[in-house]
């Protein structure tokens, strides 16, 4: 990850912090920003979706998504589910 990408993610997370959302992550997937928040903050994100999208698009993301799985530490590269044989 480059310094530029880290800075972009940090600024995107600050947008959420400014809305009072403390436990959050913005995951960088190229043109996509994947937002993770605690389940209790999901409604706040939905209520502010226009503001959040506008701010993250201005940072250079092309798409802004919300991960319905919520905030998970270490979910940048989730493991593939395993199947029993």
Predicted features by range, described:
Residues 1-85:
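ATP/NTP-dependent adenylation/nucleotidyl-transfer catalytic domains that generate, transfer
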């Amino acid at each position: 990850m480059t310094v530029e990408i880290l800075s972009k993610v940090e600024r995107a997370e600050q947008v959420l912090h400014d809305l009072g959302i403390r436990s959050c992550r913005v995951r960088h997937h190229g043109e996509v920003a994947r937002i993770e928040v605690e389940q209790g903050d999901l409604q706040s994100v939905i209520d502010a979706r226009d503001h959040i999208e506008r701010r993250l698009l201005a940072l250079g993301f092309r798409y802004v998504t919300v991960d319905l799985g919520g905030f998970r530490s270490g979910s940048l590269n989730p493991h593939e589910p395993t199947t029993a044989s």
